[in-house]
Curated annotation (Swiss-Prot):
A motif ('HIGH' region) lies at residues 14-24. GO terms for biological process: methionyl-tRNA aminoacylation. Is required not only for elongation of protein synthesis but also for the initiation of all mRNA translation through initiator tRNA(fMet) aminoacylation. Pfam families: Anticodon_3, tRNA-synt_1g. Its EC number is 6.1.1.10. This is Methionine--tRNA ligase. ATP binds at K305. Belongs to the class-I aminoacyl-tRNA synthetase family. MetG type 2B subfamily. Monomer. A motif ('KMSKS' region) lies at residues 302-306. Keywords: Aminoacyl-tRNA synthetase, ATP-binding, Cytoplasm, Ligase, Nucleotide-binding, Protein biosynthesis.
Amino acid sequence: MTDKTPFYITTAISYPNGKPHIGHAYELIATDAMARFQRLDGMDVFFLTGTDEHGQKMQQTARAEGISPEELAQRNSDQFREMGKLLNASNDDFIRTTEERHHETSRNIWNLMADSGDIYKDSYAGWYSVRDEAYYAEDETEVRADGVRYGPQGTPVEWVEEESYFFKLSEYQEKLLKLYEENPDFIGPAERRNEIISFVKSGLKDLSISRTTFDWGIKVPDDPKHVMYVWVDALTNYITATGYIEDRNGPRAKYWPADVHIIGKDIIRFHAVYWPAFLMSAKLPLPKRVYAHGFLLNKGEKMSKSLGNVVDPANLVAHFGLDPVRYFFMREVSFGQDGSYSEEGIATRINADLANGIGNLASRSLSMIVKNCDGQIPTPGAFNDDDKAMLASADGLLAVCREEMGKQLIHRALAAIIAVVSETDRYFASQEPWALKKTDPERMGTVLYVTAEVVRQIGILLQPFMPQSCEKLLDLVAAPADGRDFTALGEAGRLAPGTPLEAPKPVFPRYVAPEA
């Protein structure tokens, strides 16, 4: 096997009580870009996504449709798997919480927490949101004008009283605060970290971790009338897929603990409070980082079925093409903040950055090479200061992208790449290679060489975001098949003079809105 460094990244597992929407697609695209980046950078990556199929909400949705929860889970989980294929996600596994491997790990982690003395039986009475699968304190709820009591996410809550097992979360307050203090990067971005620290400082109550009022879930060991609270089961998926609890020497055990869990900001509490507490109790290693992205807004409004503005990712991809959609969401939205998008915004971004930017640069420079340099990469003369500065900008991109991607700041990595595209445009325009053709053909060759070399490096670095388009872009500059990972960046992989090129075909066509 490989001696590469393991890197384990996950999305949240999606709740399949409905069809996948653009919010699910956004998280999967972003996590896929991060996974691909690390693979190209020489890491041994394991990338996990999947579906979270238990809980009261699934049971209620299935009943409303007149089918069993199993049928609903199978049908909708398949739709999430299909979405992954549509988006060209490179996940190494797709986990379903209804799988036997997951039931086994969930029972194992429960028993480890019980062995630590952290689980006891009592009765629960309190406010519960079926939609959030979450319990809320009285002061987190409010009765609105319609007479209904709502939780902090704006979902209705109901009063629940039943026998329940509890986890001694109250005993983990100081341990969690110490974790956040000693590992400032455990939670990102900073707003979420501050939110969690303030929540934990305000005091933690023991957590109800089983239910008896429904049966669609994983049975509690030795007490089958109880099913596990869906979040005990759901969070455990991340460790299930590695087999770490069952066999520390198993083929995937090396991936635990996870390098980063990518999640939505609405589920930060489960991942940054409950999950590390469960793992501490089970005496298992903690993930290194939990990073919460924001919500996608449609023209500034939150998407909801009632507003009728929920976007199906398949429609967006059919309309604009896959890679342009992937690129838009990674470039336009600051990862970690809420972001707004519109079809006009996508069109503008495609045309500015892709068609007029990298596409135009590649097409102009490579067409000139094919036409004026016998259809092959020219041999450059001595590099002047402009050439050296241009190459240095391209050569320096990997370090910048590594740093930004390491902090999940995908939008900043892309902004840095596009800044170099703009710089190359200015370089190309100011050097006027078309005018040099008659006056100084060797200098023309040098300018074209430098430009093509920057296009090559841009093509390699954009692969995590637009894999299919960048494959075509790298074909245009005849980058060898084994010279497309990050070891080929910089001087190590410079274009070889004399390499034959074919006339470039457009990789990023302009988007023209269809006639109404």
